[in-house]
Structures are given as structure tokens and as C-alpha cells.
Swiss-Prot record:
This is DNA-3-methyladenine glycosylase. Residues 1-42 are annotated as: Disordered. It catalyses: Hydrolysis of alkylated DNA, releasing 3-methyladenine, 3-methylguanine, 7-methylguanine and 7-methyladenine. SUPFAM superfamilies: FMT C-terminal domain-like. The gene is Mpg.
Amino acid sequence: MPARGGSARPGRGALKPVSVTLLPDTEQPPFLGRARRPGNARAGSLVTGYHEVGQMPAPLSRKIGQKKQRLADSEQQQTPKERLLSTPGLRRSIYFSSPEDHSGRLGPEFFDQPAVTLARAFLGQVLVRRLADGTELRGRIVETEAYLGPEDEAAHSRGGRQTPRNRGMFMKPGTLYVYLIYGMYFCLNVSSQGAGACVLLRALEPLEGLETMRQLRNSLRKSTVGRSLKDRELCSGPSKLCQALAIDKSFDQRDLAQDDAVWLEHGPLESSSPAVVVAAARIGIGHAGEWTQKPLRFYVQGSPWVSVVDRVAEQMDQPQQTACSEGLLIVQK
């Protein structure tokens, strides 16, 4: 049908009539931007979401056709989730990204195991902390301590003692237990299988967000004058770990398997150079009888991020070694 507006006026800038052909409903593309030329369309014409627009230069037509074909091919190969994350800006936005976006996040079943087993299983896993501005901090766990519950004289739950302070130790596996020491430092624990049992996270190998960790540590230091903290000093201790990740009492009793500000991810498998895990006495345990020297602290041998190295435990007779998850070797005492 002829274009509306009558004949074009002569002279400079005159409008030329354009022939427009509407496609049948069955040939309409699903949405703008993924148009495909119907079989009855003229070569060299541009097809939009709803109609065919008149003749256009052949080189431009070919370029547009090639671009649309590449787009269509890529969209067919992507999952809906991949298409969402490939949209510019969405990958970094805290509103379009959540812990569920991390396929390696460890669920509640991971934490539902005895304290000693969980303490060993933690090694090599990655602790993630998301700050309010969307910044994510990551660190690989390299040192833990197991506390076995009421029978353990060094545990806060010894004798079955349950108070508002240690309630997190008696909640479901994966619950955070954060407590204050010396009136100014925090320690991060995770409840395990068994009432009153938990695992203390002692040290991390910083992986992501090191400068932010350094700033957080410096903001809480008594004196910021002098040398800057080295990378190995950022998370080499339970309280340093909490400072570097901005973890305080407000995290107490949160669910590590469900929380949107802190969670645990699978660590990378490094089977090419498996680590050796040492079992040694826990740190700072006094007046706990035989429990003082029980080898319930576990750390990756040779890691520069471990808080305290036990040379005696490392130099004992060659222990039996068995493979475990994440490519680590466990030293059996």
C-alpha cells in the first residue's frame, strides 16, 4: 500500500515514498532484536520485530544480518541464567547477584557432621563475606579448631552449660557462634553435629579483596602509624580474621548455609600438589586437664597464613596419610 502523506514535495530534502509490507502473524519474530528474515522478504531489506522496511544498502544489510545471526546463535547456546549474568552491569550489582548465584556454595548437609570431621573438612574451603556496598571478600580456610561439646572441658558448652551467649553452639549445624574476647575482639565459630559442639575458624589465606581487608584491619588497630600490614598478617588468627571480614556480634546465630552476607564455597581442587594437614594442640587452652593437649587443632602444613606452627607435631614420626576432599592429605595421629 502507498505510504501516507501523499506525494513528496519537490526540492531539497524532499521525502521519498517508502513501501511498507506487514508480515503475517505467523511470521512475526518473537521480539525486537532477534528478527529473522521471512522467506518472502526481499533480499537487502531490514526486518524489524513487526514489519519490513524498504530497501537499504547491501553492505549495511549484510552487517546487520551477520550481527543478528551471531546474537541468535549465542542466545541459543546460553541458559537463561547465563543470559542474565552476561547483561552489562548485572554481574556486579548486589541487586541481581546473590549467594544463590554461586553454584559452589556449600549447603546445610556439609555442616551436619561431627566437629572433628567438620574441622578437617573446612580446610581448603573458601569463606565469603559480602559487605553492604556489594564488595565481596574471600579467603581459603587454612586453620581450624574442634570443640566437642559437653564432654570437652575447653568448650564453652562444657558440662552441657547453655547460656544466651553460647546458644549458637546448640542450634542446627551451620549456625554461627560469635563471641567477644578481651572486651574488644571477636571469634567466629560454626556449630557442627552434636549439641554444644562447634568449629573455630582460626586463619584464612586471603584470596579476594585484600586491600579492603587491610583497610578494615587498619581501622581497628591501636596505631595506624608505621608499616602496612603484610598479606600474611591479614587473617592469621581468629580475631584478625573477624576484623578483616568485618564480622562482629551481629553475625551471632546466623545460618552460614542461608545468609546473604556470609557463606562458604567449595575450594579449588589442587590435587597436583596436595597439602598435608597437621593435628596439634589447641591454642590458649588452660585449666582443661587432659583436654589441654588433645590434638584438636588442624592446619595446612607449610601455609604462611597459619597463626601458630607446631614444630613438634610436624616433626613426629612419619604419620599415616590418607586422601580427603579438596585434594588435601590428612595427617592421622
